């Protein structure tokens, strides 16, 4: 007679402290994530042979880096749906504090389905934390007196135990059940989250120039929204930076928007060519110029702030001429 093997239930009471130091980690003075007692050593997610513990450790690190980024970037969080109470299911968009009143320009960033405010987990482990997160982009934009609004379409599930929006991967890794109480009303999908958030931002910003960044799946969300609303916002549009653009010509219905993309957008794709080089031999179906993002997409995130400002400068000079 066979006995049913007991399945281990994930314990939710693992406490990793309130900061990276409690996990024997630190962000060094030169902005690298390293071990607290060995600042020259990379941190490791695989800290034990216990896979479940490692998953908890992994997300605890991401949460602490998220909090560090939020604090150092001075971003404010805007609840989506709007005016939700802290205990009601909601997600967030993130904005620099003068985004409504700044007339100089605004940059709207739609992230991929990565952890909120973090571009690349690989870069987080190996590179400058400011560039692995959105902090470097924000610093470069605000230095040019541009406001920034960031969308994180991955965190659309509500963890009612701590009243916090989470990613699907987080729920899976922690053994959490997705129930009706996990669903955030009105923003059940990334599309609805982006649509509600962008409608709010576009209606409340006084800026006459809006620049856009769409990263990976975020490029699809951005294109879908602008294609549908192009006649309303075309007069304010500036540079459009796409990373691994996922939209094809058949999905874009406004010919004026397609024409604008061809003239004003860039799409960055992984390739063996040097990072940031124009790939003349390859064009997307919509005709957007493709540039090399380097061998791995993570490589490009180190340069995203520089590329964005370069595109904004070109757009500004074109507008003046």
Curated annotation (Swiss-Prot):
Keyword vocabulary terms for this entry: Cytoplasm, Nucleus, RNA-mediated gene silencing
One GO BP: regulatory ncRNA-mediated heterochromatin formation
Main location as per UniProt: nucleus
Highest taxon, organism lineage: Eukaryota
Compartment(s) of residence: Nucleus; Cytoplasm
Family matches, as InterPro entries: Arb2, Arb2_dom
One GO cellular component term: nucleus
Oligomer status and interactors: Component of the argonaute siRNA chaperone (ARC) complex composed of ago1, arb1 and arb2.
Function of the protein: A member of the argonaute siRNA chaperone (ARC) complex which is required for histone H3K9 methylation, heterochromatin assembly and siRNA generation. The ARC complex contains mostly double-stranded siRNA. Inhibits the release of the siRNA passenger strand from ago1 together with arb1.
Record's protein name: Argonaute-binding protein 2
Gene encoding the protein: arb2
């Amino acid at each position: 007679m066979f006995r049913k093997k007991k399945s281990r239930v994930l314990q939710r009471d693992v406490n990793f402290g309130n900061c990276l130091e409690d996990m024997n980690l630190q962000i060094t003075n030169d902005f690298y994530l390293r071990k607290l007692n060995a600042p020259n050593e990379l941190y490791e997610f695989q800290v034990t042979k216990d896979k479940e513990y490692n998953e908890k450790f992994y997300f605890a690190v991401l949460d602490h880096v998220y909090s560090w980024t939020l604090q150092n970037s001075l971003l404010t969080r805007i609840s989506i749906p709007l005016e939700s109470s802290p205990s009601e299911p909601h997600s967030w968009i993130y904005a620099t504090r003068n985004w409504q009143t700044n007339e100089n320009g605004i940059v709207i960033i739609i992230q991929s389905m990565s952890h909120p405010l973090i571009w690349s987990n690989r870069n987080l482990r190996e590179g400058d934390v400011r560039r692995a997160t959105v902090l470097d982009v924000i610093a470069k934009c605000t230095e040019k007196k541009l406001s920034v609004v960031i969308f994180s379409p991955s965190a659309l599930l509500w963890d009612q135990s701590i009243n916090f929006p989470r990613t699907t991967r987080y729920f899976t890794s922690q053994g959490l059940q997705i129930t009706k109480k996990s669903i955030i009303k009105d923003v059940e999908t990334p599309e609805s989250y982006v649509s509600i958030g962008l409608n709010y931002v576009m209606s409340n910003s006084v800026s006459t120039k809006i620049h856009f960044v769409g990263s990976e799946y975020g490029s699809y969300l951005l294109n879908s929204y602008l294609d549908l609303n192009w006649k309303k916002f075309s007069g304010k549009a500036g540079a459009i930076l796409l990373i691994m653009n996922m939209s094809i010509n058949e999905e874009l219905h406004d010919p004026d928007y397609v024409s604008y993309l061809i003239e004003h957008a860039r799409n960055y794709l992984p390739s063996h060519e040097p990072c940031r080089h124009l790939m003349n031999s390859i064009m997307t179906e919509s005709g957007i110029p493709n540039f090399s993002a380097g061998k791995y997409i993570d490589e490009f995130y180190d340069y995203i702030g520089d590329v964005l400002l370069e595109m904004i400068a070109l757009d500004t000079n074109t507008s003046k001429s």
